């Protein structure tokens, strides 16, 4: 079955019916933002879109999160919400937004770390955990996922 945890990574937002339960079973099809859009990394954008639409000459983004301006851990959390392997939810689905601390919403599963099959990272593996254990990461205090990956470009099949 497709769970709210699946949707948290494969759609930008989905509203569960029946209130804010930890694991809603039903979702309103008309209240799903399909795909992974800007809001997944930049947070809710209604106020941003309204402002920019009314002020097209303003080139500085307002009312939207710039992940590059977040702390290192908050930047990592933006990616880890979908790339940290199994996590136990402690708050309802779709409550985490960029700039918040992931540990307030999920408990990372340190027991089931990502397995390497033939040298490849499993799709639902713990890329976050692998990064944190890498020599590159531990040698610096500034490395984040975006040090090697550009989320604004399709980089499928490319080595980091």
Task: Map each language-model feature to its residues.
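Parallel beta-helix/beta-solenoid
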Residues: 2-13
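Primarily the internal scaffold of c-type cytochrome electron-transfer domains
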Residues: 1, 15-160
